[in-house]
């Protein structure tokens, strides 16, 4: 039904396709698989990350007595040690954030034949709004080379802010697991319906199969290849 409605509205289909292109895809990983892992992670203590901050502050405050390089060096070394273990999960969080933003773009279009899904997406994005609020410092590999991005990168290395935020996000992911999968399923259904509508437009003819509970089953097709 949704594919048929999309098929009849070429302009809306194009607008929706642009949003899904903007969302993109996560290369080399399955977001749903990583979501399974993320929600199953145990929340780790941030004690070491806060300790690194204290070392850095102490090195700066007592710069006349202690070489500040020691505090900076310790912060960076411990940062990369822990970052290597969770980097792939950062990508997962970032993609979920993009899905949430994409859901917002779709509902903003106010497409009439998506009314049922718009209501669902609005409820989901409201429930998952904390994920967007808490994930802004997470670096995901999409570095654009800007001065702002470079400054944030140094901030992350020195303060471990992204690692601290990620540890705090783990519990939120666990609590909102059902809603996260509802988001993935709903957007996936809309995108698959767009794909069906687009494929139909490529064909000279197509049909919708009719299933019957008949004891005398027969299959008859023509011009099939």
What are these regions (language model features)?
Residues 1-225:
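Alpha-helical coupling/stalk and coiled-coil linker elements that connect catalytic or binding modules
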């Amino acid at each position: 039904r949704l594919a048929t409605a999309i098929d009849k509205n070429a302009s809306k289909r194009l607008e929706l396709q642009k949003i899904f292109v903007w969302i993109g895809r996560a290369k080399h990983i399955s977001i749903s698989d990583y979501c399974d892992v993320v929600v199953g992670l145990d929340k780790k203590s941030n004690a070491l990350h806060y300790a690194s901050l204290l070392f850095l502050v102490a090195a700066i405050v007592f710069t006349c007595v202690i070489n500040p390089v020691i505090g900076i060096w310790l912060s960076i070394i411990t940062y990369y040690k822990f970052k290597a273990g969770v980097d792939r999960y950062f990508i997962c969080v970032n993609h979920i954030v993009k899905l949430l933003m994409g859901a917002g773009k779709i509902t903003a279009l106010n497409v009439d034949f998506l009314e049922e899904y718009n209501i669902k997406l609005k409820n989901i994005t409201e429930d998952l709004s904390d994920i967007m609020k808490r994930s802004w410092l997470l670096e995901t590999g999409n570095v654009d080379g800007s001065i702002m991005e470079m400054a944030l990168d140094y901030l992350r290395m020195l303060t471990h802010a992204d690692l601290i935020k990620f540890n705090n996000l783990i519990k939120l992911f666990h609590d909102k697991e059902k809603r996260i999968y509802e988001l993935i399923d709903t957007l996936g259904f809309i995108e698959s319906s767009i794909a069906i509508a687009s494929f139909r437009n490529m064909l000279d003819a197509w049909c919708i199969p009719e299933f019957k509970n008949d004891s005398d089953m027969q299959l008859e097709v023509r011009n099939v290849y």
